[in-house]
């Protein structure tokens, strides 16, 4: 049965019922003039203005010993966004642990980096079971425990696929998802992670098994959400369809590479998935493994990542013809950075953030100075006007277009 609740506009004004005779009407008007207006409680109250709503909220919180001025957002200037269409709020800049934790940097430097990030408002810390063969998770968990940060103030994410040498210790089988996540939690010294990612697609495992296993670990309290990494739009859509068909939990986010020279997936494919099924984007490598940092403008320095034996592929990319073209484009972008009063890395990170479809950009830093510089991109973001973005596009000449753009 439909119950009708009248709105304020539906309640007739008392003046509409005045008697027709002038003498009686005059008496009624005199009576109404001294009578208090009807209480508004019977009506749906009008939504208060932003200032009034904030004032009421401040008064309410003050009673409970909480202040709006003492929030992390207000104290640090960090911006927060929803992870896809989920309710999880993540800092728009996160700290990744690939290459650095357990490898390129010492445990002391790792602690310093996490402290700087946390005190700057970063709440998102990303790792994976494969990073430094699990050591990155150990270091991350040890620092969290040592610092005594509230678990509820953190968003910890990890990724599963490569867990060990045995055939059953890799992939996305139900066995490895459950056992792999248990192993990650032990190394992290945590009861749960906020998001567990499938680190790549697994053609050897049926999609239904993957989705069922992810749903299971969430229902068991081992994770809050699950997402994908390096998956195609078609694979993500298949996972969503399977989840809906069998009343299971779909992914909320895709981790994708995104920077000035890698744009199509994040700017064309993922926005369509976001609008259709609510999958957001968490991006990594905003400086293209250091290529955009400017350090490779005159070759490969000895202390750089590209000089390491295991990163010969990066060195080859830098010295290739395409790599030289990219360095020339970066030189053309430098005047824009100077005009905005920022460094080239800050411009590159702010350029990623200007895409509102990106929930968070993962930073990878090997020194405190690098991290502080990259976090400064937050101050550059308001300067990323449409004019500045068009200037950058004119230099890069790689803006992707979707089929919708061609039809319009």
Swiss-Prot record:
Protein keywords: Cell membrane, Cytoplasm, Ion transport, Membrane, NADP, Oxidoreductase, Potassium, Potassium transport, Transport
Pfam family, one: Aldo_ket_red
Subcellular location per the Swiss-Prot or TrEMBL entry: Cytoplasm; Membrane; Cell membrane
Binding site for NADP(+): 97-98, 104, 126, 199, 229-230, 255, 284-289, 295, 305, 364, 366, 370, 373-374
GO biological process: regulation of delayed rectifier potassium channel activity; regulation of potassium ion transmembrane transport
Enzyme Commission number: 1.1.1.-
Keyword Cell wall biogenesis/degradation: no
Family, as annotated: Belongs to the shaker potassium channel beta subunit family.
Subunit structure: Homotetramer. Interaction with tetrameric potassium channel alpha subunits gives rise to a heterooctamer. Identified in potassium channel complexes containing KCNA1, KCNA2, KCNA4, KCNA5, KCNA6, KCNAB1 and KCNAB2. Part of a complex containing KCNA1, KCNA4 and LGI1; interaction with LGI1 inhibits down-regulation of KCNA1 channel activity. Interacts with the dimer formed by GNB1 and GNG2; this enhances KCNA1 binding. Interacts with SQSTM1.
Domain statement: The N-terminal domain of the beta subunit mediates closure of delayed rectifier potassium channels by physically obstructing the pore.
UniProt function note: Regulatory subunit of the voltage-gated potassium (Kv) Shaker channels composed of pore-forming and potassium-conducting alpha subunits and of regulatory beta subunits. The beta-1/KCNAB1 cytoplasmic subunit mediates closure of delayed rectifier potassium channels by physically obstructing the pore via its N-terminal domain and increases the speed of channel closure for other family members. Promotes the inactivation of Kv1.1/KCNA1, Kv1.2/KCNA2, Kv1.4/KCNA4, Kv1.5/KCNA5 and Kv1.6/KCNA6 alpha subunit-containing channels.
Name this polypeptide is given: Voltage-gated potassium channel subunit beta-1
């Amino acid at each position: 049965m439909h119950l009708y609740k009248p709105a304020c506009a539906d309640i007739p004004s008392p003046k509409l019922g005045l008697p027709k005779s002038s003498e009686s009407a005059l008496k009624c008007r005199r009576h109404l003039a001294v009578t208090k207006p009807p209480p508004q409680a019977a009506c749906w109250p009008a939504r208060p203005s932003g200032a009034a709503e904030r004032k009421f909220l401040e008064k309410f919180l003050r009673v409970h010993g909480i202040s709006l001025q003492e929030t992390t957002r207000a104290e640090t200037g960090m911006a927060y966004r929803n992870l896809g269409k989920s309710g999880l709020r993540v800092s728009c800049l996160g700290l990744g642990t690939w290459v650095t934790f357990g490898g390129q940097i010492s445990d002391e430097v790792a602690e310093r980096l996490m402290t700087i990030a946390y005190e700057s408002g970063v709440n998102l810390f990303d790792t994976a079971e494969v990073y430094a063969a699990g050591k990155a998770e150990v270091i991350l968990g040890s620092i969290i425990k040592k610092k005594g940060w509230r678990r509820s103030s953190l968003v910890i994410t990890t990724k599963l696929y490569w867990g060990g040498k045995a055939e059953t210790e890799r992939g996305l089988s139900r066995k490895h998802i459950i056992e792999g996540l248990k192993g990650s939690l032990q190394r992290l010294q945590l009861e749960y992670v906020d998001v567990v990612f499938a680190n790549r697609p697994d053609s050897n495992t049926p999609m239904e098994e993957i989705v069922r296993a992810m749903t299971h670990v969430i229902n068991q309290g081992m994770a809050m959400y699950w997402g994908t990494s390096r998956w195609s739009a078609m694979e993500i859509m298949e996972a969503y369809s399977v989840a809906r068909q069998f009343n299971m939990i779909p992914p909320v986010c895709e981790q994708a590479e995104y920077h000035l020279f890698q744009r199509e997936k994040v700017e064309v494919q993922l926005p369509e998935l976001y609008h259709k099924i609510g999958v957001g984007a968490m991006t990594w490598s905003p400086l293209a493994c250091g290529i955009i940092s400017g350090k490779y403008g005159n070759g490969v320095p000895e202390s750089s990542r590209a000089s390491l034996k295991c990163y010969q592929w990066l060195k080859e990319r830098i010295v290739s013809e395409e790599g030289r073209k990219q360095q020339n484009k970066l030189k053309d972008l430098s005047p824009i950075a100077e005009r905005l009063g920022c460094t080239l890395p800050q411009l590159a990170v702010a350029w990623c953030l200007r895409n509102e479809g990106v929930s968070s950009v993962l930073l990878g830093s090997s020194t405190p100075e690098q991290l502080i510089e990259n976090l400064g991109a937050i101050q550059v973001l308001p300067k990323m006007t449409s004019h500045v973005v068009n200037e950058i596009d004119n230099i890069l000449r790689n803006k992707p277009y979707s089929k919708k753009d061609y039809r319009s």
